[in-house]
C-alpha cells in the first residue's frame, strides 16, 4: 500500500492507496509544534482504527507547503516505516512543463493538482483550490502548467473581518438565507460568501479570456463544496484531486 500525505497550512490530509484505489483518508489539523514522534503516534492511532499496520505501507509520498513539517514527516517515515519518502519538489519528475519565472517557487500542492487534473481530463484546465489561500492554476491544452493567481482564503478573509472590525463577531462560514441580510451575522456571511463567489468567478473569467483554451474548471479543497453550487464557472468538485495527484507522481517516479 502507498501512503500519500498532503501538508497544508491548516490541515494535513492523509490517504492510503491499494494500487489505484483510495481505501482510506483522513484530515487532521496542521500543528507545526508536533514532533516526528507525536505525528507517529497520531498515524499509528489512525491506522489502528482502520485495521492497518505500519508494515502494510510499502512507500510514502509527501507534498508540503510547511517546510518545518516536511522534515518532521521525512523523519517519521524513516523511523516508523524504515524508508525515505518521496517528497514533491526539486528532483521529482512531474511529466509537466512548468512555465513559471522560477519553477521552484510554485507550491507543491499546485503542481500536484495540475498533474492530477490533466491526467484525468486531458484538456485545458483551471483548478481552484480552496485552502488557507485560494489558488487558481491554469494548465493549457498541451498539458503545460502556465501559472495562476493566489488570493486570501475564506477563513483568512473572515478572520481579518473579525479582528479588524471591533464590533463584529466571529461567525461560521456558511451560505446565508439571503444576500439582503437582516442581522449582523447573516450580513457578514453574505458579504464573505457572495463576495467570494464573485471573486472566484471574476478571476476564472479573466483567466479564460487570457488563456483562450476554453478550459474546464475544477474545484478542490475543504470549502470547494460550499462555494461551487453558487459559482457560475466551477464545473466540477473533486475533493480527492490532490491525493490522486500524489499517487500519479509516485507512479511516475517509481517507474524511472
Swiss-Prot record:
GO terms for biological process: coenzyme A biosynthetic process. Its EC number is 2.7.1.33. Its cofactor is NH4(+); K(+). It catalyses: (R)-pantothenate + ATP = (R)-4'-phosphopantothenate + ADP + H(+). It holds the Pfam family Pan_kinase. InterPro entries: ATPase_NBD, Type_III_PanK. GO terms for cellular component: cytoplasm. Keywords: ATP-binding, Coenzyme A biosynthesis, Cytoplasm, Kinase, Metal-binding, Nucleotide-binding, Potassium, Transferase. CDD domains: ASKHA_NBD_PanK-III. It comes from the Bacteria. ATP binds at residues 6-13, 132. Gene3D superfamilies: 3.30.420.40. Pathway: Cofactor biosynthesis; coenzyme A biosynthesis; CoA from (R)-pantothenate: step 1/5. K(+) binds at residue 129. Substrate binds at residues 100, 107-110, 184. A monovalent cation. Ammonium or potassium. The keyword Transmembrane helix does not apply. The active site is at 109 (proton acceptor). Belongs to the type III pantothenate kinase family. Homodimer. Catalyzes the phosphorylation of pantothenate (Pan), the first step in CoA biosynthesis. This is Type III pantothenate kinase. It comes from Geotalea uraniireducens (strain Rf4).
